[in-house]
């Protein structure tokens, strides 16, 4: 019988079913154990994280005053490591041809009602120009799995195309990649093409449930999918992004699996996930969220975000436009550090608006605001919308990035970088109202940069940006 082993290379040993069940039972038995919960909150306050078992107890806790303390700590930890910066990105769908049979995704091979589309390099060019004209600097590439139509060569060529496009003052400076599990060799090629974070959602960590949800196609292989991040790391990609699709399975099980996956990467490679995404199942063409009885409430969603934030303090946390404005507002302060804005979830949706009957979207967007409206809203809430990609371009990835975050030194890098990239956005793309709000925020925030030397350089650079210069970074 297999034992639980965090640093094993085998999926069923590092995501160990019995260990998860034991964890959930332990959490259930201790959900009213105030002394233990208070002790865990104190441990979490040291900002060194919690184990999956400890985090599971906090997630089960249902005493209002303790939940309040957990939320309060999540906000403090977020403030300490990420300040009030929110990184902006947009998804770019390259192709929705797919050979898999995932029953919760409208791209599944049997769906005959969806419009299938694959962008040519020229169409990618048009999409990227549209994205640059909105002000985006960071993209997440999305593509269905199709060995002949979306081979790795197509993805690599697309990455090169995206980086090559310089339109007016626009530039895409980091391309993160969300494609199906692949080989060590292909991960190496992605790295060489300049890809940023490699993102792959587990969907669910429950093997049996996973196999039911993925009946056909290469993705039906649980171990191959679950061990993808190990292969990515072995292929030299040191920033990886994990996530589950909450609502496919019971949230407690997947929450525990997610943290075990993070512990596994830390144990085996010395560096945990760069990001964790927390999407929730939602309706789309041929998919009705109501068919999934495990869908979670906003209240539980907030709790999940808060506990992940204190359990893995060094990991960025991402939400998409599946979440409504109200839902996003709540979780931003509890731990989210990266959001998408102005997203189109259809293939080719940026260059031209999709016709209603030409449905190629992966899911229905709840937050339909433009990027400028999202930036304006963030400024209104006191956040710094950041278009920064400096760490990736300075080679501060993997353990170098983590060391910087852990030392708390990131404030002297990130704050000025965020302000300078926001300034670029205000100069080149913002509406007048957004520009005025942004200028005020930049004035206030520049004063808060701890290191006087860096503050002085930042002020000088901000002035240069106003005069038309671009692309400064610490």
What feature does the model see in each segment?
Residues 82-123:
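Canonical Radical SAM [4Fe-4S] cluster-binding loop centered on the CxxxCxxC motif
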Residues 143, 197, 223-287, 297-326, ...:
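Conserved C-terminal portion of the radical SAM core fold
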Residues 109-126, 130-233, 238-248, 270-277, ...:
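Core AdoMet radical
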Residues 90, 128, 156-163, 187, ...:
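Generic structural signal for well-ordered alpha-helices
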Residues 213-219, 290-294, 360:
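Short glycine-enriched, charge-decorated loop/helix-capping segments at active-site entrances
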């Amino acid at each position: 019988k297999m034992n639980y082993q965090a640093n094993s290379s085998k999926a069923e040993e590092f995501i160990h079913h019995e260990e998860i069940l034991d964890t959930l039972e332990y959490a259930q038995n201790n959900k009213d154990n105030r002394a233990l919960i208070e002790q865990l909150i104190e441990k979490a306050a040291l900002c060194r994280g919690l184990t999956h078992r400890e985090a599971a107890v906090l997630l089960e806790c249902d005493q209002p005053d303790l939940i309040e303390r957990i939320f309060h700590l999540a906000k403090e930890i977020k403030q300490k490591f990420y300040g009030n910066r929110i990184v902006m990105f947009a998804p770019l769908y390259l192709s929705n041809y797919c050979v898999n049979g995932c029953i919760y995704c409208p791209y599944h091979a049997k769906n005959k009602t969806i419009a299938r589309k694959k962008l040519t390099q020229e169409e990618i060019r048009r999409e990227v120009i549209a994205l640059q004209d909105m002000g985006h600097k960071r993209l997440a590439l999305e593509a269905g799995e199709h060995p002949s139509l979306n081979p790795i060569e197509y993805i690599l060529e697309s990455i090169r195309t995206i980086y090559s496009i310089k339109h007016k003052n626009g530039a895409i400076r980091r391309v993160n990649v969300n494609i199906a599990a692949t080989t060590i060799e292909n991960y190496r090629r992605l790295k060489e093409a300049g890809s940023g974070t490699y993102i792959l959602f587990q969907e669910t960590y429950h093997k049996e449930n996973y196999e039911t949800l993925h009946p056909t196609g290469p993705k039906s292989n649980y171990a191959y999918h679950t061990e993808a991040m190990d292969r990515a790391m072995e292929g030299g990609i040191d920033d990886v992004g994990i996530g589950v699709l909450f609502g496919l399975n019971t949230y407690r099980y997947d929450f525990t699996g997610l943290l075990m996956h993070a512990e596994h990467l830390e144990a085996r490679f010395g560096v945990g996930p760069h990001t964790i995404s927390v999407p929730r199942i939602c309706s789309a063409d041929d998919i009705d969220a109501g068919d999934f009885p495990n869908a979670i409430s906003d209240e539980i969603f907030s709790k999940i975000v808060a506990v992940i934030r204190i359990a893995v303090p060094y990991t960025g946390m991402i939400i998409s436009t599946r979440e409504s404005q109200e839902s996003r507002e709540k979780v931003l302060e509890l731990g989210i550090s990266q959001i998408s804005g102005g997203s189109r979830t259809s293939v080719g949706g940026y260059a031209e608006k999709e016709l209603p009957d030409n449905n190629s979207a992966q899911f229905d967007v709840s937050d339909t605001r433009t990027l400028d409206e999202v930036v304006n809203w963030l400024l209104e809430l006191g956040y710094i919308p950041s278009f920064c990609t400096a760490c990736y371009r300075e080679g501060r990835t993997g353990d170098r990035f983590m060391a910087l975050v852990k030392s708390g030194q990131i404030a002297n890098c990130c704050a000025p970088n965020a302000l300078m990239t926001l300034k670029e956005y205000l100069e080149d793309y913002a509406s007048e109202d957004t520009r005025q709000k942004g200028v005020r925020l930049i004035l206030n925030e520049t004063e808060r940069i701890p290191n006087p030397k860096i503050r002085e350089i930042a002020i000088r650079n901000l002035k240069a940006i106003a005069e038309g210069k671009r692309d400064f970074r610490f």
